[in-house]
Amino acid sequence: MSHSFFNLFLISLFLYNNCIAHHYTFTVREVPYTKLCSTKAILTVNSQFPGPIIKVHKGDTIYVNVQNRASENITMHWHGVEQPRNPWSDGPEYITQCPIRPGSDFLYKVIFSIEDTTVWWHAHSSWTRATVHGLIFVYPRPPQILPFPKADHEVPIILGEWWKRDVREVVEEFVRTGGAPNVSDALTINGHPGFLYPCSKSDTFHLTVEKGKTYRIRMVNAAMNLPLFFAIANHSLTVVSADGHYIKPIKATYITISPGETLDMLLHADQDPERTYYMAARAYQSGNIDFNNSTTIGILSYTSSCKAKTSSFSGYYPTLPFYNDTSAAFGFFTKIKCLFSGQVPVQISRRIITTVSINLRMCPQNSCEGPNGSRLAASMNNISFVTPSHVDILKAYYYHIKGVYGTRFPEFPPLIFNFTAENQPLFLETPRLATEVKVIEFGQVVELVIQGTSLVGGGLDHPMHLHGFSFYVVGVGFGNYNISEEDPSSRYNLYDPPYKNTMTVPRNGWIAIRFVADNPGVWFMHCHLDRHQTWGMNVVFIVKNGREPNQQILPPPDDLPPCYE
């Protein structure tokens, strides 16, 4: 065999191996699980809770055949995956697709592009993501290498919430009554509540490590409604990635992680191997609302330890910040910096300013269970988003179907007031119900300022997630954003801001983010506290096609779930 032919053979083999499409099958069905002394049926993927881990290399394309064998509708979202030109597989129900109905299938095409580390997948239909979720491990494509030392082992950690009741009943009740949803009964680590909860001595996550080894923790906060503090006793964590992108390493004794966020952390097993160490997670909650203030516990022990590997109260417990310690929560958030500097767009094409608020809607005879007999709601720029119920927005946009949505989402708050004042006029609390989107030209550099308000209860934190893009968090602040300032960039970090897809707006504060609208399609933005999403704290961005063929939405798949008008 000639050298030239052999080299051509090797090149062809390399290209073939790098173009193989990976196929997965996700079968969604109800499976009984017992926790906290009671048994209930939960939605699962492949009968697993949490769901299976997907492993890809940067730039891969995978196909996931979702088979709905459950009794309710389902969709899947690939959180943190930008899906270039492919909104058809993004997943939010009635935003980019109609649901996969019981007995039906849909083949998702998931296109990875700029994602480097850990992202995740979850259901995106009602509150089905409570148990339908899992991690996605992204690896560098050779010859690329990691910008931090390679760990000896990888550890998936999914933080979540557990209700003893059927989650469908929880949702149906608070939607029907207009009140707040019942808080969860437990927090979980990889689905395990931990031994502090009833009937959970054997339902505790246990991590065994070897002295001198390094472990890469790939973590997501999959909780429905709670930002969380997390720590491991006597062990520091080196945070190396956030939301699928590398960051400047942060050495931390605790981390704060909001629903939807992912973190990669290096854990060095460098403590006394004869001791037992506990990991713990509990809520960060700055607002005046009911919440689950319990603590979930996991166990870390060393392989050489002679101690029994069972739950006990004799080990070392971590120190976590107090539940309402805002300085601790945002002290961690603001340490996150992009590993590579100088990439944030300096000049912007468009500035959009929106408020995010909790609201009230009046009920006849004050018959609802919100404050003063009202119905709780939520809004962006005083519009409480109404999700379509028959045709999804992407289909309506692509096929020019009228009457599904409007295009009048305001670029500026419709009313200017002291957004963070202690006492607000009652008339400000009532939102407008509508399905309004914001249309953006391809290639525009968008600055989006999100301002929290103190309406109804004094304000809350809001982890805001944008589909289809990662964005630079160029500013974070407390109080009112100066909306009259012509050029606020002098107060921004335009050097190494974090590059994320989910960022928390502080209670009675604001964030400023920037992104380039170079991904045509229909893209959802919403609060990742699911009660707020259910109440309407959402908006849709439609990014128009560019001029070139590679700047236009891909054609729809043949097996897209049908809509029923």
UniProtKB/Swiss-Prot annotation:
Cofactor note (record): Binds 4 Cu cations per monomer.
InterPro entries: Cu-oxidase-like_N, Cu-oxidase_2nd, Cu-oxidase_C, Cu-oxidase_fam, Cu_oxidase_CS, Cu_oxidase_Cu_BS, Cupredoxin, CuRO_1_LCC
Cofactors: Cu cation
GO function term, MF aspect, one: copper ion binding
Record keyword Glycoprotein present: yes
Signal among keywords: yes
Binding site for Cu cation 3: 124, 467, 526
Principal location class: secreted
One of the record's GO cellular component terms: apoplast
EC number(s) stated in the UniProt entry for this protein: 1.10.3.2
Binding site for Cu cation 2: 79, 122, 528
GO biological process, one term: lignin biosynthetic process
Tissue: Mostly expressed in siliques, particularly in developing seeds. Also detected at low levels in stems, seedlings, and flowers.
Cross-referenced Pfam families: Cu-oxidase (PF00394), Cu-oxidase_2 (PF07731), Cu-oxidase_3 (PF07732)
Residues of the Plastocyanin-like domain: 27-143, 153-305, 408-547
Substitution effect: residue 152 to G: In tt10-1; transparent testa
Keywords annotated in UniProt: Apoplast, Copper, Glycoprotein, Lignin degradation, Metal-binding, Oxidoreductase, Repeat, Secreted, Signal
Subcellular location: Secreted, Extracellular space, Apoplast
Signal sequence range: 1-21
Reported function: Lignin degradation and detoxification of lignin-derived products. Involved in lignin synthesis in seed coats, in seed coat permeability, in seed germination, and in root elongation. Required for the seed coat (testa) brown pigmentation by mediating the polymerization of proanthocyanidin (tannin) from its monomer precursor epicatechin. Slightly promotes seed dormancy.
Name by which UniProt lists this protein: Laccase-15
Organism encoding this protein: Arabidopsis thaliana (Mouse-ear cress)
Designated gene of the protein: TT10
